[in-house]
Amino acid sequence: EDFIRDPLDSEESARIEYDEDTGYSLIIIDLPIVNSTNRRVLSFVTIPLGIIIGNGIVMTVCDAENEFLENFAKQEDINLKFHSRFALEILTTIANHYNRNLRLLNKSRIRIERELKNNITNKQLFKLMEVEKSLVYFLAALKGNDTIIKKLFRLPAIKRFEEDEELLEDLVIENNQAIETTELHQRILESITSSYASLLSNDMNNIMKTLTLFTVLLTLPT
């Protein structure tokens, strides 16, 4: 019961657990979904996805409907016979999903930056901050997932087969690529937001100086 309930908690962190009494294993990983509450700019949050494995059963548990699970379920080559293969396939697909969303975020960042070159406003800076917030969520989730990948085959319910080696290698590469890309985009965004925030602040200071001078001129006796 806990294995089903835990992934439904939005605050649940990525982890692996094995229940000796039932023989079931629980893998909780973080999945990116579009932040539907933010209509100003494309942004993401992450939610827990639970994978329950054991006794010939594989089950996924998630608190929200999402594009990832729908697309994954449509795949014709899903292998449920080998639990290790299924776990690796779903983790690899999630890593690919992060990389795809990172490309979307980068396109959004480039578009906002183009707008900023024409007119520096708080609105555009807030949009960049939303993109930056998405990257913070991504990095925390990807590092948590990386820990899960390293612990995956320590579970008694998941046996490692020779055929899994290539898939595991692909998974590690995809997840590491997502981590490195996220860190790179974070550094770029920090530099951009800092530069434009400074320019906006300077513009405001110049405006205030002009207004002050204008006020002084108005108060001078004629």
Residue ranges of model-derived segments:
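Helix-boundary and N-terminal cytosolic regulatory elements
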Residues: 1-78, 108, 144, 148-160
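Short C-terminal domain-edge/linker segments immediately following a structured domain
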Residues: 11-14, 57-63, 82-84, 89-95, ...
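Generic detector of short alpha-helix boundary/capping microenvironments
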Residues: 15-16, 44, 48, 93, ...
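Membrane-associated alpha-helical segments
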Residues: 56, 107, 111-115, 120-222
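A short, charged helix-loop
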Residues: 66-85, 110-119, 125
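A short, ordered amphipathic alpha-helix with a cationic face
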Residues: 77, 100-103, 139
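Long, non-coiled-coil amphipathic alpha-helical linker/lever segments
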Residues: 77-94, 98, 160-167, 171
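Well-ordered alpha/beta subsegment
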Residues: 85-109, 121, 128
